[in-house]
């Protein structure tokens, strides 16, 4: 009887340990929405960034350029990444709003920090904290970490350079504000703009990275670490 009790206790402990391990290693589901003009979204986001994020072993990324499918995909997603500049219909806008207002995380990459949607001003006000309407020509820019204490900048060099579009990103004073983590500096004019930042929101974690035009950023180690850190920060 004593042996049976010990066996049952050991089995129960095994089940508890297994359950805890499974909970700790749960793969989080990410929806990444790309598509639009001026960029090879499928190659550099749907393939390269997806590979970078999934290399952590913690995430499963579904990439789509079908914006009509956003409401369906968000029903099972844990985190949303937007990197598109193509239209999003009213149903998609409503689904994204509901998703974020319920406290789910949002990561905005490159094209998604633009003023893309005139019919959805609340997007830039509430989720971007401003936006970009122009950029410098494609050329080498300096990226400078200005908040080295933040989780998103851990392991990132204090300065790193690559060829990209320097977005002239302007914060909106009517928004709840952003916290700038990395700035991009023009080698041509010395002008500086937010390169990576978090957006203040009462319910959700939101972060943004403004660079990401082509392989020169997506395959750069600093960019890849910044991307992974941003996803980790939002997910946790």
Language-model-derived ranges and their functions:
Residues 1-25:
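Bacterial Sec-dependent N-terminal signal peptides
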Residues 24-28, 54-55, 72-75, 188-191, ...:
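Extracellular ligand-binding/catalytic regions of CAZymes and related secreted enzymes
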Residues 24-33, 37-115:
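Helical hinge/lid and interdomain linker segments adjacent to catalytic or ligand-binding clefts
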Residues 33, 86-155:
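A glycine-rich, often tryptophan-bearing local segment used as a flexible ligand/cofactor-contacting loop or short
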Residues 37-38, 87, 113-114, 186-188, ...:
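Short, solvent-exposed loop/turn segments at secondary-structure junctions
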Residues 42-45, 92, 119, 193, ...:
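Residues at alpha-helix caps and immediate loop-helix transition turns in enzyme cores, especially N-
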């Amino acid at each position: 009887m004593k042996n049976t009790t010990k066996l049952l206790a050991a089995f129960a402990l095994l089940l508890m340990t297994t359950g805890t391990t499974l909970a700790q290693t749960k793969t989080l589901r990410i929806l990444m929405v790309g598509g639009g003009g001026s960029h090879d979204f499928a190659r550099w986001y749907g393939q390269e960034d997806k590979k970078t994020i999934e290399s952590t072993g913690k995430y499963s990324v579904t990439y789509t350029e079908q914006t009509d499918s956003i409401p369906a995909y968000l029903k099972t997603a844990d985190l949303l990444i937007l990197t598109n500049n193509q239209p999003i219909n009213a149903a998609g806008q409503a689904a994204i709003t509901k998703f974020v207002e319920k406290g789910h995380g949002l990561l905005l990459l490159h094209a998604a920090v633009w003023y893309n949607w005139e019919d959805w001003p609340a997007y830039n006000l509430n989720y971007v904290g401003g936006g970009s309407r122009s950029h410098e020509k494609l050329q080498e820019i300096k990226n400078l970490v200005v908040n080295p204490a933040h989780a998103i900048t851990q392991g990132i060099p204090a300065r790193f350079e690559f060829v990209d579009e320097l977005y002239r990103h302007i914060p909106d004073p009517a928004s709840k504000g952003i916290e700038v983590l990395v700035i991009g500096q023009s080698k041509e004019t010395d002008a500086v703009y937010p390169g990576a930042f978090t957006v203040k929101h009462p319910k959700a974690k939101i972060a943004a990275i403004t660079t990401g035009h082509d392989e020169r950023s997506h395959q750069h180690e600093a960019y890849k670490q910044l991307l992974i850190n941003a996803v980790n920060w939002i997910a946790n």
